[in-house]
Amino acid sequence: MEVRILTEADAEAFWNIRLRALRDDPESFGSTFEEFLERGIAGVAQGLRKRTGESDDATFGAFDRTIVGITGFMREQETKRHHKADIWGMYVPREARGRGIGKALLQAAIAYAKTLPGLEKINLSVVLTSKEARQLFISLGFEPYGLEKHALKLQNKYFDQELMSLDLTR
């Protein structure tokens, strides 16, 4: 398995796996399938091009012949928040879970974060129904620091998200 930062050339692969994530696990993401579909592959390619051009943001992909997992990394840009970054959009399809793909993606994002001067912490949120993802985050040192009740609403059903953080200064 190879984990690397995605480029514009990976737009179609990212597009397909992200659409699958939003279709198969809609409660785990803030975006909807329809919202992402509207962006189109051209919008995805532009986003990946922008991310690879900005040294602090990256989208990671795990490949085992084809793409088998994704996660995003975005550093806060405001001066008072520039010491923080966020993990977003992490997804590994059900049939690929349990093979260490999510762990490899997160380890790549954490290693990347440690190369960025002044970055002190990485935050993420995880929907409480994603027990395996939560356990993975804890195993890599993320610590819970809060709970956002009713963080997401899908078809009149609410989903709570646990807020977690990894201290890079330790």
Predicted regions, residues:
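Glycine-rich acetyl-CoA-binding "A-motif" of GNAT/NAT acetyltransferases
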Residues: 66-69, 132, 158
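Conserved catalytic-core motifs of GNAT/GCN5-like acyltransferases
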Residues: 123-126, 138, 143-159
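Conserved glycine-rich acetyl-CoA-binding loop
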Residues: 80, 89-107, 116, 128-135, ...
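Acetyl-CoA-dependent GNAT
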Residues: 8-9, 15-16, 20-89, 93-95, ...
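Short hydrophobic/aromatic beta-strand or adjacent loop that forms the aromatic wall/cage
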Residues: 57, 159-163
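Extreme N-terminal starter segment of soluble prokaryotic enzymes
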Residues: 1-3
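Conserved GNAT acetyl-CoA-binding A-motif
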Residues: 113-125
